[in-house]
């Protein structure tokens, strides 16, 4: 079973680096291993980029090992050095609030029970918050060579630019100490993180060996980019794709993955789903021979939306996708799903219809950007290509009535088969 997890991670392409592979394999084979990954609360929510380490923890649990998900309530107040410069320090209350929210998200990805593989959630503020300056310098700092710390690539680049604060420079020590604490408390023997964390993770394994005389392991997963080299998990507007449905709607989340390029979708299925090799091979064949069906993309979107938001949200999103384009009933959508779907389908540009404002179909087509001019709008109507709530509009003098508004608030405008826009009635 334990050797199987490394084999599975290999074929899925999920191992970027690791400490001695043979020793790790032997230790995994000798019984359940406790494995951890840490997540700093640098925002109110985790984002899609966190999925790889999160799902890797889940894979270890399914293979018979015990996962620890660590919320960085302390390290989140410091900030891991990054290339773009010094981080803005958030208040302790803000970080605590974010850590609480993130903890709830972390708990969705692993199983909690009373078995030897039942997951644990920790917060490094529990031990770092009690660490005095003297203890930090004597019990941690003594084990770290400044020469080695300066050799870290991110630190080097920062020193070549505007420099780096001692606060961020010391981050490595605090993360390394997390490994010591988790080993002492739970026997944790493996830390997992993104490949940009390799230096910090190895430093932790080294500190465990130096302070406790124990051998522990380090493993990193690849940083995910698409076939064009762009960072994974960025929305159309360039922002993060958040796991919090209030920050990224389930509809927007689903649409991101259903629009995955053919060149990326099979890799994403390996990294982000628990589908078997045979199932993925079938979807790969479908992509190569029947790409127009987009079977792999639809399966990817369904798996990940269900994983993050639940089966009910996935069903609602798929119904919304069909309804917007005339393949299902708009009236069956709840208001929140309809509103989110409209905003996403129209790139966030939902026109407002105020009392007494221009409200003919011609005005609405121009206002929403579905027509460049009133003349173009009239031609679109005359050609039979304009729909409101999936009903074809026959006259360019059409004006919406109260009964036309879905949930007494929304109109769904469509030009042709693909161009969607929303109208929201306000102040009525």
UniProtKB/Swiss-Prot annotation:
The keyword Cell cycle does not apply. L-tyrosine binds at residues 36, 171, 175. Pfam families: SYY_C-terminal, tRNA-synt_1b. It is found in: Cytoplasm. One of its GO terms (biological process) is tyrosyl-tRNA aminoacylation. Belongs to the class-I aminoacyl-tRNA synthetase family. TyrS type 1 subfamily. Catalyzes the attachment of tyrosine to tRNA(Tyr) in a two-step reaction: tyrosine is first activated by ATP to form Tyr-AMP and then transferred to the acceptor end of tRNA(Tyr). PANTHER family: TYROSINE--TRNA LIGASE, MITOCHONDRIAL (PTHR11766:SF0), TYROSYL-TRNA SYNTHETASE (PTHR11766). Homodimer. This is Tyrosine--tRNA ligase. The gene is tyrS.
